[in-house]
Amino acid sequence: MKPAFNTQRWFGLWPGLIVALLLAVLIVGTLTAVGGASHSFSVAVTLFDPYVLQVMRFTVWQATLSTLISVILAIPVARAYARRPVFIGRGILITLMGLPVVMPVIVAVFGIVAVYGRSGLLNTVLQPAGLTIPLEIYGLTGILLAHTFFNLPLAIRLMLPAWDQVTAENWRTASTLGMSSGQLFRFVEWPAISAFLPGVVVIVFLLCFTSFAVVLTLGGGPSATTIEVAIYQALRFEFDPGQAAILALTQLFLCVCSALLLIRWLRVLTPTPGRRNDPTIRPDTATRSGKLLDFGAILVCSLFVFAPIAALVLSGLRGPLVSVILDIGLWQAAARSLGIAVTATSLAGVMAFGL
């Protein structure tokens, strides 16, 4: 018997289908129009060019390294915050962890250079003791450092809810069995983290993969160029819309493939309803070594993230602060930015609701 047409289900699907169709038409149409404006629209020549292949390899390599560093470092820091849910300033620190995400990238890069550059604050402090850190801020090292600055706090905030998935019964059972801190992480905490890890890895990887301003300012040369920067170079310096369109499509294809592979490779678990993390039911929070490790991890992470921000604030206070605040151009730019942000947020919200 032929099933009846489900009208209600269709009306529930059409908003998402319309939004998806509009996005597909916008992306494909824009790239096709840009590529059609070029007389050198050759996919094979562009994709198999040695320079383009090197750019693709470097893009994937730096995104992979940045993701591994950010996520691996985020796990112990997030665990430290989870094991110490009550201490003075905890909420403020977690809230301020969102600053790197909303900061202008170029401004943040200036702060990173001011702290970790050759003549930065870190080497200035160590110099009287005869110590220096030979950190090459321009090149792959600088890119990884900047990506970690932006994505480490994001990964921490995204993974913190994982500990709320662990039930009180699990903690009590672990306490009864006398589990060590390492056993707790392996058998109790890791299954909860695994439910959040795929999403965190995909988000951080795609942010690093499509990074533009960081690579443009800290890349240091053609050997440290990503696809995003290559697109900019093709339009700005070579004026080759065809090559830019091919590179953009290639980046889109690689992003989709990378996200699908990462989600498939990493084990995805369904989050289980737990309870708010209670320090009184964890069997590993009372030891002195555990407290030192947790607060040490929180302190080091806070210094790493907030030092560039503090350097920017101090530099701004030493500048012509009053004249900048009274500059009408500043407020016009702020109003323009606010208008664009509100419009983009509204459109994104409506489209996301439809999808």
Model-derived segments and spans:
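Cytosolic juxtamembrane amphipathic/interface segments immediately preceding
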Residues: 2-12, 51, 182, 279-286
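Short alpha-helical segment immediately N-terminal to, or the first helix within
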Residues: 45-46, 162-163, 187, 217-220, ...
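Alpha-helical transmembrane segments of integral membrane proteins
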Residues: 261-297
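Short helix-to-coil transition segments within interhelical loops
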Residues: 166-193
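Glycine-rich helix-loop "coupling/hinge" segments at transmembrane-helix boundaries
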Residues: 114, 213-239
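Solenoid-repeat scaffolds in large eukaryotic assemblies
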Residues: 174, 243-244
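A short amphipathic helical element positioned immediately N-terminal to and/or at the very start
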Residues: 3-4, 41-48, 320-325
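Membrane-water interface segments at the C-terminal ends of transmembrane alpha-helices
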Residues: 7-41, 50-164, 192-219, 244-263, ...
